[in-house]
Amino acid sequence: MSHNFTESYDIIVIGAGHAGVEASLAASRMGCKVLLATINIEMLAFMPCNPSIGGSAKGIVVREVDALGGEMAKNIDKSYIQMKMLNTGKGPAVRALRAQADKEVYSKEMRKTVENQENLTLRQTMINEILVEDGKVIGVKTATHQEYAAKAVIVTTGTALRGEIIIGDLKYSSGPNHSLAAIPLADNLRDLGFEIGRFKTGTPPRVKASSINYDVTEIQPGDEKANHFSYTSRDEDYVKDQVPCWLTYTNAESHEIIQNNLHRAPMFSGIVKGVGPRYCPSIEDKIVRFADKERHQLFLEPEGRDTEEVYVQGLSTSLPEDVQKDLVHSIKGLENAEMMRTGYAIEYDMIMPHQLRATLETKKISGLFTAGQTNGTSGYEEAAGQGIIAGINAALKIQGRPELILKRSDGYIGVMIDDLVTKGTVEPYRLLTSRAEYRLILRHDNADMRLTEMGREIGLVDDERWARFEIKKNQFDNEMKRLESIKLKPVKETNAKVEELGFKPLTDAVTAKEFMRRPEVSYQDVVQFIGPAAEELDEKIIELIETEIKYEGYISKALDQVEKMKRMEEKRIPANIDWDDIDSIATEARQKFKKINPETIGQASRISGVNPADISILMVYLEGKARSISKNKEKQNHV
């Protein structure tokens, strides 16, 4: 079939949400000519749901995106109205940063970045069709019948694919925030042979700030101590005049209103068909599932400095508008609240992610990548993490360079992608710290140590940032060596100081590092014995040193597990393997192998329903095949 291409690009990204902007920025910064196509330019990097970035596990993803050279962390550091470190009373593995965003500023700042990026064209247009020939992407076709050539296409359409908004018995075609739905593109993906799922998410009502009685709610201020998402941000730029959030609760009256109107709730009347998120359920779902709970938390979150809109976090609903008003007015502090926007549910198509490789390229079509909610995830941060990986790998593919696959031990982004492509998902996927088996080495404080070198090799970390990183890494390494080399001996003067600080005296000589392993001993305590470092250390480096030393035993065990898994990941499975040729593996394992087509022994071992015996049989089979190929080569060489 002949095509009339009017423009040509290396990569075309469809959708300018949080996945799309990261994908397009990464690819263009790597030297590719990129088109970022969006249905509505005004919604670039928009926040149709909660006005925040970060949180448990998610905040670590934002730092990983930053370490690789992405934009989300820098952008939220320019647009937050409140910053808070979560789980400070718990161990370092679960600590994470969360920022309340000024959603308009966030979107505008990201748009400035996109518009000023070299090699990147931003255009408002609707893509209706992905053009494919001989199993390869060749371009796209727009709603206005324009055809653009491309070597790779990245689909990051969020909830727009055949999107439908639902409020009570009202249901209409729409993308997020009442934008246009991408129906022809959804049809096109089905026609291309992809297995499509149907998911659902939702959003709560927004209320007017001046109509809230804050006196009967609990204030939730931000942190005074400076924290940032981006490693490039400076403490002196930390916002001091932060905007508080407020805490209130549902009550018996709220629950009664919901119970009395369940017959009108789309969730229970049969109107909603899509599968909703387990970890962010609607309020009506919570009331039914947790009927024994007397109340549920609700956070009143301002959507920005220059707007009256307040997001009622925890009150996601698709109940009819009149019921929503009664529900809002039953809540303490919201008795006279003016509802500015109605909550709604949105159903949308998504691609079942077992059809993807770990690069986020589809197995079916070469050069076609997908990222974000299109792959069945929920959340801006999960979208950004996938977006940057899809953008990087699309660029690497057309440049003929080795692909980037983040392992589960590299970062939460690696955990997420491996979960998606190996296990799939039957509901909107949300990242949790419990999903990561190596979470003690995937911390908020060490994302740069884990991933900056990768970002540099790819070409996304510039010279200035690399120089700063090298200084930090050298300072960290040098101080760790110093702490290992200096010994504290149990002599009278030393023990006198030890006891003066309130610690048990030394009985044997120990290194400064060993002394610091004591739970009660801080880095500053140790400095009193050995003196300060040659260079003054930043507080963040000191925190990193303390964590690495105090949790060294656990970290060491985790790294041993990583090495074992690495050996399994290095054992590749041929792409053309005939799974029916392998005798003795269980029927369930054979079915799963055919469906997912794992690329390594490590990936195969993580598929649900596959047991160790199946893996052993698979390894024996592959070793036998390798020997057979080797013998055939020897025979040919003798001929």
Curated annotation (Swiss-Prot):
Its main location: cytoplasm. SUPFAM superfamilies: FAD/NAD(P)-binding domain (SSF51905). Gene3D superfamilies: FAD/NAD(P)-binding domain, GidA associated domain, C-terminal subdomain, tRNA uridine 5-carboxymethylaminomethyl modification enzyme MnmG/GidA. Keywords: Cytoplasm, FAD, Flavoprotein, NAD, tRNA processing. Homodimer. Heterotetramer of two MnmE and two MnmG subunits. NAD-binding protein involved in the addition of a carboxymethylaminomethyl (cmnm) group at the wobble position (U34) of certain tRNAs, forming tRNA-cmnm(5)s(2)U34. PANTHER family: GLUCOSE INHIBITED DIVISION PROTEIN A, PROTEIN MTO1 HOMOLOG, MITOCHONDRIAL. This is tRNA uridine 5-carboxymethylaminomethyl modification enzyme MnmG.
